[in-house]
Amino acid sequence: MSAPDLPKLGLSILGGGVTGAMYSVGVLAALEEQLEDFRASELDAYVGAGTGAVLAVGLAGGLTAQRLYRALLNPADDLFPMKRHHLLRLERRELRRAFGATVAATKKLFGSVRKHPLDVDLWHEVDRFFDALPAGVLTMDGFEQFLASVVDRRGIPATLDAFERPVRLMANDLDAGTRVVLGEAPHEHTSVARAMVASCAAPVLFAPVELDGRDYIGSNAGEMGHVDVAAQLGCAHVLVLNPQVPIRVGPDSSRVQRLRQRGLLWVYSQSWRIVTESRLLQGLERFAKAHPEVALHLIEPERDDTTMFTHSPMNFAARREILEDAYRRTTLALRNPQHPLRAALEAAGRQVRESQGDAG
């Protein structure tokens, strides 16, 4: 099947922090290596959420997954020279506001105790301190400046409407409580760097990002991995990359036997992943039934793969392990004639290169 005759293939890359982006790069690099007529930078539409938004922009801007893979493996490569300080920068404005509000709440507490020592509404006073918490601990300002420099140096379009192939980045309007598609009207002229950080602004950790007078927070998988956006752009097939899934552990697990032994954050992470994965799978199933003309192909880590789970989403130092693990597992899947991923991609007109052989 020649390239012009191939069905339109869209890509939806979901978030998952730095480690999630590394997983997605590893998967896409393996697809480029193993498949005929597949280059991740030449697909028909790109949808990105969270750190997936950064990857979507890079691919749509002409960077191949193989190039990104090599660059991220090599710390000396200057393609995407991200450092910790680009992300780990305190949101001083919010912290100053929180400090002032905490002082005010403390004064009101002591005032209430002095005036009515026996009638103090403790929970009401505690609420004042909750209201004093910052909207986010870190700022995306440094990351935005870094992304803007990368976009400029690599010749990537500076606004979302300037791409040759459609790019849609997902965020949530904080005050409206709704999903927003950056790249569609009235946000088609949005700065690429600003749109990326709006999609990446994970609540609590990062302060909301202001865009056109509105506050935005990062998007996650949503109810259906945002495949509806790719379908509206005319894609007959949509690849969905979801790096974050619940882990399955037990006595035979090499790193973890019981999650409760690893503490509160591990338990919370597993709980969040269970809920998110359930919503995603149910949403994809509903969409598939309502739109049988659109074929959906979900790519995720194996449930027993502890590589993605045991590293913090912000752990840039784990990039080599995650990149190579995702690349290796995807390659093995594609070399297996019985694997559903291979069958799905062949249905989309992308054949495994014969020279790569089979692992059947």
Residue spans of the language-model regions?
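Patatin-like phospholipase
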Residues: M1-A49, V57-G360
